[in-house]
Amino acid sequence: MESQLYIKRGKAMKNHLEELRKQKGIKQEELAAILEVSRQTIGSLENGRYNPSILLAFKLARYFEISIEEIFIYEEEKEHE
C-alpha cells in the first residue's frame, strides 16, 4: 500500500489574514482597493470560504512583507489505500 498526500477538495486553507490586516489598522475595503479585488474577496479569504489565486497570494505577501507561508496555513492529509 502506498500513501499519497492530498488537499481536500472544496476546503479553503486557514490563514492569518484578518489578524494581519487588523495589525496594520486597515479595513477590508482599504486592503481590497490596494490589492485591486473586492471587499467580498477579502471577507471570503478571512472567513476561510475562498482560496486565493497564486497571484493574489503573492500580492498579499508583498503587501504585508512576509512569506506566503506566514499568511496561509497549508495542511496535508495522508490518504491510505
What does each model-found stretch correspond to?
Residues R49-K59, E77-K78:
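Short, basic-rich loop-to-helix N-cap that marks the start of a DNA-contacting helix
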Residues M1-K11, F72-E81:
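Short, charged recognition helix plus adjacent turn
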Residues V37-Y50:
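Recognition helix of helix-turn-helix/homeodomain-like DNA-binding domains
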Residues K11, K22, Y50-N51:
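Short amphipathic helical patch at the helix-1/turn junction of helix-turn-helix
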Residues L55-E70:
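DNA major-groove recognition helix of helix-turn-helix/homeodomain DNA-binding modules
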Residues N15-I34:
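Short basic helix-loop element that most often maps to the first helix and adjoining turn
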Residues E30, T41, E70:
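Residues in the helix-turn-helix
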